[in-house]
């Protein structure tokens, strides 16, 4: 994991010296969870390959075990803008890493005399978490000015090396390119 992040940082920093379109956006849902701010840049021009780095806030709850989670994440994405003018098909792959606080009420069946009694037990803490996502969307982006994006991000979470969650996360983004 550290090698992947280190390689990503080396590649993106080497490319920053080239002329490219950059944008800053307010992101709602998608890889941001609830909301986030991201910086996007093309490797060259206003289309083709680029990257997206952000800061996001996520919050979620579950109903079966009174589960809740919230925290700050850093979405990283490599993407491709297909289209020559201002309208683009966005295709991308990425990962969100973050620190999250969680709490859960689980119900444990007791032993011995309490065999039929269900006792609530609360678990809480802070943990590092991550997910992987794809990006399929539309982006309106001029070389300078208003930018808008909308789409779907198929998202996968893991536990002990196995997929334990998958969602189709819609997203919206509004910002400015420069």
Regions found by a protein language model. Give the residues of each.
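Generic cytosolic/nucleocytoplasmic N-terminal low-complexity/intrinsically disordered segments
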Residues: 1-2, 43, 78, 152
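Bacterial Sec-dependent N-terminal signal peptides
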Residues: 1-22, 178
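Generic structural signal for short, solvent-exposed loop/turn connectors between secondary structure elements
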Residues: 13-22, 29-34, 85, 160-165
């Amino acid at each position: 994991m550290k090698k992947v992040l280190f390689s990503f940082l080396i590649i993106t920093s080497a490319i920053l010296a080239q002329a490219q379109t950059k944008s800053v956006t307010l992101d709602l849902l998608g890889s941001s969870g609830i909301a986030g701010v991201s910086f996007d840049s093309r490797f060259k021009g206003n289309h083709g390959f680029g990257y997206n780095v952000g800061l996001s806030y996520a919050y979620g709850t579950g109903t079966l075990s009174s589960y809740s989670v919230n925290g700050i994440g850093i979405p990283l994405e490599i993407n491709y803008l297909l289209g020559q003018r201002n309208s683009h098909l966005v295709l991308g792959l990425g990962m969100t890493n973050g620190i999250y606080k969680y709490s859960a009420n689980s119900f444990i069946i007791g032993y011995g005399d309490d065999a039929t009694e269900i006792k609530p037990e609360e678990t809480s803490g802070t943990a590092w978490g991550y997910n992987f996502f794809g990006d399929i969307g539309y982006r309106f982006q001029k070389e300078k000015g208003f930018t808008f994006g909308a789409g779907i991000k198929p998202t996968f979470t893991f536990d002990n090396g196995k997929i334990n969650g998958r969602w189709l996360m819609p997203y919206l983004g509004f910002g400015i390119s420069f």
